[in-house]
């Protein structure tokens, strides 16, 4: 009964953003592995290191399978195109977190492009963005040995209790403290970053 299911994954491990985008301290990867074991036992076939459209033509997929479901993660990021963006030392979360997760998993210290992992060890770190991804970066930076970590949020600090503008059952706009925030760092609200400043091609501050 049912259908035979094959999952194609571009990376070398199954799990997508759950495995490479979320830090180990927030989601232990053993839970993913356990679920994959269950799915494999139930008959799901997983094929890694397959880039559909590059390694495997879409025409072949459509010929060999009765249905094709597109479930790729959103790895494209929103940039901040302000003066100084080209300086070294400015990284996107989706550059930083996957490499840090690979190091945690015991993978080689260079990625598929030969680049070393980005580390916050011994550095003063500023995170632009006050959401969950920023908190993931904050916790990762602490674990890597950052000297200090500041997280900037463009919006004002939310209220301590549910705002009238977000009544039930809408998602409440409230001030929240994640486990990463409990470990330290400074959160700064109502900050609009307008320029990165640097010296000798490397970022040294922002305005």
Identify the role of each PLM range:
Residues 1-7, 133-144:
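N-terminal Rossmann-like FAD-binding beta1-loop-alpha1 element of flavoenzymes
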Residues 3-19, 148-161:
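Glycine-rich FAD pyrophosphate-binding loop
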Residues 19-20, 80-84, 138-140:
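Short amphipathic alpha-helical segments
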Residues 21-26:
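Short glycine-enriched, charge-decorated loop/helix-capping segments at active-site entrances
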Residues 28-78, 85, 95, 102-115, ...:
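A Rossmann-like FAD-binding core segment of flavoenzymes
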Residues 118-131:
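Beta1/beta-strand and adjacent pyrophosphate-binding region of the FAD-binding site
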